[in-house]
Amino acid sequence: MANKIPENLATILKEIGETPATSLWDCHGTWVINHKSLEKVAVRFGIKFDDPIIIETDQKNKCVVLTVRGRRNVIAENGKVTEVTDWSFGEATPYNNKNGYPYAMAEKRAKDRVILKLIGMHGDTYSEDEADDFKNSKPKGVR
């Protein structure tokens, strides 16, 4: 069973008009969030993305590896605005992606990871698109 939902994650979900029941589920003790909610989080926090950089592509074999960099402004206690950036890989290959659209899956995985990093939740919460096991465990009530 997963630990209690982190308070900051529950607050973020409330700010985007979602609830844990509509956005999260427990997969073997790890919180998983749906992609739709992460897109809303990116808008709420003003996260912007650079164009992806394709590291490897093999269209015939449906293999794509790319990186995405994201950024957001953070206001410090002293009122100073600082731009915070982070990046991640997104991979889609036949062994980790059953969909017929590897470029879109690689991009979704990379962006979702960057969003989670930029809000301080990566490692505590995962995106539904990071693993088929996560998506397959999604309850019917979660959109």
Question: Predicted segment positions?
Answer:
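Polyanion-binding surfaces on beta-sheet-dominated domains and ring/shell assemblies
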Residues: M1-R143
